[in-house]
Amino acid sequence: MPPLPATYRLQHPKRSVWSRLGLWGLHSLCVLLLGLPILTQAQRQDPLQSQTQTQTQTSTKQSTQEVQSQQQDKKAQNAAAEQDAPPTPTVAPARAISLAPHITEILFAAGAQDHLIAVDSSSDYPPAAKDLPRVGDALRVNPERLLELKPDQVWAWQANQIGPELQRQLEQTHISLIFAAPEKLDDIPAFIRLAGDSLDTADVAVPIAALLDNQIAALRQNSRLGKTVSVFLEIGSEPLYTLARDPLIQDVLSTCQAQNIYARHAAVAPTISLEDVLHKHPQVVITAYRDPAQLRARHLFWEKHLGLSPHALLNLNPDALYRPGPRLIEATRELCEQLDRYRAQVS
């Protein structure tokens, strides 16, 4: 900054206090002097404001205490109401009766075994089913015994197993009647799901049904490229009869790329002649015998009359093959594997 001119310094050799304060100092002093009355007035009003603030704080504190008290009273009232309220009634598990072996197996697979209170006389699988009371067989049901057990659900195979009179009684007593007659492999997991839904065991039934669905799909996928094989399914030997137009057996055979030589027969389980079988000359004979001696005799019979080699004579568990329950899917897998071995032998 350049020095001040000499004339300026000479003209003001001595300045008073006011000149030293300058305009800014004079302004600050005025503000200070003018503000004293305001400050004094504000100080005079402090007691009133303090009293008001105290009253406000007291009022707020009282309001908070009142709200807290009301909340505590409400909690106490709710607790008292909960104590005085009657207990929630528990719903008794549904009670079910099975009138067919495959239905018993379906209900067990669905996790509903604890709901079963009785079964038919042929239900022997799983082994625990043998311990349940009996209410008749596949053809005759004891109505008095069935109604005496007071079931919520009755699972039957077909309507003629029940009869119109018992159906009427079940309807009058509000007992549900459910028919379970699978006509294809996919129906088996579907009935397992139904059992899970109706008996509240879906947590078990749904994953089991999904597993069976996947197994069926895998069987169809694996067998679809196999060459079709003609088969004769021997159900009984004296007289000789077979399964023809049974839709479930047809689905089992088609899943394994097998063709029933009696698929076009008018009857479901016709009696047939040996001559007719010889005329149709199947590539494979499928039997289902438990007794080893009987099985050996039947295989020798077909070796003699049809000239079939041992690998063309197949045998399966009769209960697994002829009961439309979960084990039929495993029997289908075994049949597909045996047919694949036959194809490998003749290719």
Predicted regions span which residues?
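Bacterial Sec-exported substrate-binding components of ABC uptake systems
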Residues: 2-104, 201-232, 281, 334-347
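Extracytoplasmic substrate-binding proteins
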Residues: 90-95, 153, 158, 164-241, ...
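A short, structured surface patch at a secondary-structure boundary
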Residues: 94-149, 153-166, 261, 289
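Short, structured coil segments at secondary-structure junctions
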Residues: 112, 131, 172-174, 256, ...
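His/Asp/Glu-enriched short active-site or ligand-binding loop at hydrolase and phosphoryl-transfer sites
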Residues: 120, 246-269, 289, 312-315
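Short helices/loops that flank or line small-molecule/ion binding pockets
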Residues: 143-150, 173, 272-281
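A ligand-binding cleft/hinge motif common to bilobed small-molecule-binding domains
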Residues: 161-172, 284-305
